[in-house]
Amino acid sequence: MVAFITGATGFVGSFVAEEFLRRGYTVRCLTRATSSLQWLEGLPIERAVGSLNDKSSLEKAVEGVDVIVHVAGLTAARNREEFFQGNHIGTKNLLEAARNTAPNLKRFLHLSSLTVCGPAQSLERPTLESDPCKPLTAYGESKKAAEDEVNAMRGVLPVTIIRAPAIYGQRDTAIFDYFKAVSQGIAALIGFDDKRLSLIHVEDLVRGMADAAESPQTIGETYFLADDPFYSWVEITDVTKTALQKKNVLTLRLPHGIVMGVAGISEFFGKFSSKPPVFNYEKGIDFVQKYWIGSVEKAKRDFGYQSKLGIELGIPKTITWYKENKWL
């Protein structure tokens, strides 16, 4: 069995590659000629050099594979067009390549995002997979367009969509900034309301993704994967302080107006950088929402999904890795 993985040189994709290797698959990874293979070093993978924008390279890369796991995508971009090129068109190209040169494909697993749906309206009513999608940002809209392409292929390919919430874990550079700030004695909480969010450790995510890819029940379906409880940032901060053995941490509550102002300034100065800003106005919109929560009941019912780590085990494991690798 051959599993083809996009985005394997990155944070989540490298863990996906490891998970499918553990399950006995031959793993083939799409990489650019210039991609860093830091997280794939020493792994017995096949490397397919190509790009999601190069249809001929994709057709060659997926030829004869059994499973495709599409992880690659843009989380930061200069404009709406870049998001749609990276997330929507790239997915469309990969689906067409799979249709053309992977006739025995058993699963096309697409990693999407909770941002496709927009935030839940209340803590008592987390978002369900069947709810109408109301993305708030160009990123969310581009991921929704990618999902639409996947769903359009349901009669042609055995597709499954996984919607992930905020993801943390070893190798992550995004939520790392939060852990670093707490290690330096500062915890910044956004707003004065009791925000809740779905969260998942990368190892729980990739285990759930692989289980979904191997289950006949999940063909044509969409699932949220996350820890079962919803967390507050106060809870996350408390677990982080304990893991860091940091007692004296200054907690700052940042008004939404300040957050949005900083986001706007970051976006402005990002226009003069060679890379798109990680924090921009649309990211600010995401950050000030109260309930980024999705129900995992469908995943539990259909293929027995259950997170094993939770923040009580996942955060200490992550921080230990950061320390061992001199990030903290």
Tell where the protein language model's regions lie, with residue ranges.
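NAD(P)H-binding glycine-rich loop region in Rossmannoid oxidoreductase-like domains
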Residues: S36-E41, I45-I89, R99, C117-P119
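Conserved Rossmann-fold NAD(P)-dependent oxidoreductase catalytic core, especially the SDR/UDP-sugar
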Residues: N93-A138, T160
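Active-site Tyr-X1-5-Lys
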Residues: K134-T160
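Substrate-positioning beta->alpha
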Residues: A145-A146, D172-D177, I190-A213, G220-F224, ...
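Mid/C-terminal beta-alpha module of Rossmann-like enzyme folds, strongest
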Residues: D211, S215-F279, V296, E312, ...
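Amphipathic terminal alpha-helices
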Residues: E297-D302, Q306, G310-L328
